Amino acid sequence: MPAAKHASLNRRTLGIGVINYAYYLAKNGVRYSDGSANGLTHRTFEALQFYLMKASANLAQEQGACPYFHETTYSQGIMPTDTYKKELDAVCDEPLHLDWDGLREQIREHGMRNSTLTALMPSETSSQISNATNGIEPPRGLISIKASKDGILKQVVPEMDRLRNQYEL
């Protein structure tokens, strides 16, 4: 455990994810398969990453960067907007909406409090507890049966009656 504690304190890694994304898309009347969700998805995840990085940079400004910040690509001024697969531009031509160059300069000057911020996982347990759809995945059905060590759980997608035809299964 000392090695894990050492890494945790020096990297200050987080794993912030997303649940209920299928509900978010259904509520906004867009779909995974026809491209109508692409712009909304771009804007949402740009904001998620930007504001998480901004908050971490603000914390670094107040409390100092994580000790291993120098080992991250962020310390070299490399941002997610520099490393994404450019082939995605053919799928979604949404421009960047936030001040990434300003954030890059803040991070160069003050660092970040956390070396990692996001982890987009299925989030099965969190979704069950919140009666939300799993992570960023479409639901398998409007109603699903899930087994756990605590028994059988019937889970219904949020607002099933109203959004029944908006969910993409």
Question: Language model features by range: what are they?
Answer:
Residues M1-L169:
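Long, C-terminal-biased catalytic regions of enzyme "large/alpha" subunits
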